[in-house]
Amino acid sequence: LALALVIVVCTTAGVGAQESDLSSAVFAGGCFWCMEKPFDELDGVVSTTSGYAGGHVVNPTYEQVSAGGTGHSEVVRVVYDPEATSYEELLYVYWRNIDPFDLDGQFCDQGHSYRPVIFYTTDEQHELALASADRVAGILGKPVNVEIRELNAFYPAEDYHQDYYIRNPIRYRYYRARCGRDRRLDTVWGDQAQGENPDPTWLDMQTGSMN
């Protein structure tokens, strides 16, 4: 029994140390169902969780957020290994999975809870998010309409929203097609839509160079 207790304690400590080496980022890009998949496909991402952020209601429900008045947006929280990927790479994927010109919603989903927002948690994330917005505006040739603000709290969404594209692949594909998401992304981003065909100069942001 004593040996078993020692093993449990050591194992738990090891997991905690590994988790402490991870970082997180929170993004709003319209329907959170559609924002999990592109980040899940990125090497170095450990997990994605759909949820709510930006509002004043504690532990909101989907019904409350959808009805309005909570101030929350649908978001995805991305936990990643900074040794395997970077916040800059997450930003690259984020921008190319949203319509950066629509501040009032995304695609067929309009309203406050669907507006695009980059929620930062550190000064470095704030600086990189601002730099990325300038970079995207330069690439696309006009200003972007995406809010960049500090994260006050993140609340996980209900279980049935998590991994929706995996659990309900047919409904997910139908919703995505009906909403015109891919069509609009192709119009805005061309062959870089959804984060494909990465721009090799994007990570110049890591050195502070935006050229």
Positions of PLM-derived features:
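Flexible coil/turn and secondary-structure edge motifs
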Residues: 14-211
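Bacterial N-terminal signal peptides
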Residues: 1-12
